[in-house]
């Protein structure tokens, strides 16, 4: 089974809730982005702001985790808001500014309009980029099944 590596674009405040609860929620609770991920895939969160929608600019990678089972489930947060979630094993890390490692990332060099890529809310990256970001975030990757 091939492992895929993903970026999810979410405010830091929402990332922290997901990390504390052991789940991922993307693109305002849509199911489709979660359905692209499977057990054993990796997710790194990029947070453009500290809070949604008008928080202070952050532009940092803020969390990293591995997809547990790949089972997607609805979760009622409010009477009219039932987003989809996916369980994630999060790893200890520290946030790292995007501009601190931008020049080392392949997806940056290969993308003409970087803003469009981030606005998608979820996209795949190479294993090399994953390792670059993970190491910059202080994640101990030795011995991890990648």
UniProtKB/Swiss-Prot annotation:
Highest taxon of the lineage: Bacteria
InterPro entries xrefs: EVE_domain (IPR002740), PUA-like_sf (IPR015947), UPF0310 (IPR022996)
Family to which the UniProt record says this protein belongs: Belongs to the UPF0310 family.
Protein name: UPF0310 protein YdcG
Protein's gene: ydcG
């Amino acid at each position: 089974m091939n492992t895929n590596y993903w970026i999810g674009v979410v405010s830091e405040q929402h990332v922290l809730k997901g990390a504390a609860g052991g789940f991922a929620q993307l693109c305002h609770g849509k199911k489709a982005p979660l359905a692209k991920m499977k057990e054993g895939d990796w997710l790194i969160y990029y947070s453009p702001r500290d809070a949604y929608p008008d928080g202070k600019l952050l532009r940092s990678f803020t969390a990293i985790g591995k997809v547990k089972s790949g089972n997607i489930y609805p979760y009622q947060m409010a009477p009219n808001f039932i987003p989809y979630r996916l369980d994630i094993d999060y790893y200890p890390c520290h946030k790292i500014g995007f501009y601190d490692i931008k020049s080392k990332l392949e997806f940056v060099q290969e993308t003409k309009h970087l803003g469009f890529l981030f606005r998608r809310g979820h996209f795949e990256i190479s294993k090399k980029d994953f390792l670059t970001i993970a190491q910059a975030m202080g994640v101990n990757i030795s011995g991890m099944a990648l």
